[in-house]
């Protein structure tokens, strides 16, 4: 750094070297302001999407779930089927459920 400064002082003189250093600091200042504006805009964008999309979406999803799937059915026979008959661990189920064919009164799996 001092080598560059000494070279500039020799070739350009002290006044132009001071001007170049000043212009460099102004450029750094403007770059910082541009980055600050960019970060502020990105922050406002994230805050907008979080406030108007993410939170209402999560609240809406919770509302729909609580008033549909999350609601207790108060139908014991249906709840017994849901709990006891359907496979509990997907494709790894060793005991597949028996479903009753209502019209033929026959069990098949």
From Swiss-Prot:
Virion surface side: 1-11
Membrane topology: Single-pass type III membrane protein
Gene Ontology, cellular component aspect: host cell Golgi membrane; membrane
InterPro entries documented for this protein: E_protein_CoV, IBV_3C
Record carries keyword ATP-binding: no
Pfam families named among the record's database cross-references: IBV_3C
This protein's name: Envelope small membrane protein
């Amino acid at each position: 750094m001092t080598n560059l400064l000494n070279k500039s002082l020799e070739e350009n003189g002290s006044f132009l070297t001071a001007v170049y250093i000043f212009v460099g600091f102004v450029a750094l200042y403007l770059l910082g302001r541009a980055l600050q504006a960019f970060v502020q805009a990105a922050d406002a964008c994230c805050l907008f999407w979080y406030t108007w999309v993410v939170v209402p979406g999560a609240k809406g999803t919770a509302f729909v779930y609580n008033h549909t799937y999350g609601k207790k059915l108060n139908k014991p026979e249906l709840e017994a089927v849901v709990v006891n008959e359907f496979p509990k661990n997907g494709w790894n189920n060793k005991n597949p459920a028996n479903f009753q064919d209502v019209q033929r009164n026959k069990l098949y799996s």
